[in-house]
A protein has these predicted regions:
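Active-site or ligand-binding cleft "flap/edge" segments
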Residues: 1-156
Length: 156
């Protein structure tokens, strides 16, 4: 038993070494909104966390990444939102609006909210946390024995 369900993803895993054992933290190169300049994230680590619902990072960086991305409460125009790409250890992982906008339907009403949030963790916090928003698109394999985490495109 390999520790993962092959019916839940396509392709092979792209593995990334854990750079900090305290968390599942991997090397973080850049993040970029399509059509804008890449943001250098080399001083930060990407934490892959199944216990976090969204993507959370330092407010100043999240504000820079999401500049110009406006999510209307009633989802108007979300299909025009740009892709966002995160680069971990030289490998790109792209999210579309379908990945980073939460759509919640209750009765006949669907409401939308951005699933990337800024938080002021403090001056010594050098992480960005990638929770379910990221992991819904990229099936994640936590390979504890080899101190690495792998990603493959999830099936839905």
């Amino acid at each position: 038993m390999p520790g993962y369900d092959t019916s839940l993803f396509t392709g092979d895993f792209d593995y990334h070494d854990i750079v900090e054992e305290k968390y599942y933290a991997i090397k973080f190169d850049t993040m970029q909104q399509k059509g804008k300049e890449a943001i250098d994230m080399s001083k930060y680590k990407a934490v892959i966390d199944s216990g976090t619902s969204i993507i959370v990072g330092p407010s100043s960086l999240v504000n820079q990444l999401t500049d110009g991305i406006s999510v209307n409460r009633f989802c108007k125009g979300i299909e025009d939102l740009p892709d966002i790409t995160f680069t971990f250890d030289g490998k790109d992982f792209t999210l579309t609006y379908e990945d980073y906008v939460l759509q919640v339907t209750e009765g006949d009403i669907t409401e939308c909210e951005l699933a990337i949030m800024g938080s002021n963790f403090g001056p010594f916090f050098d992480y960005m946390i990638f929770g379910d928003t990221f992991m819904r698109k990229y099936y994640s394999h936590f390979d504890v024995a080899n101190s690495r985490v792998g990603f493959a495109l999830a099936k839905h």
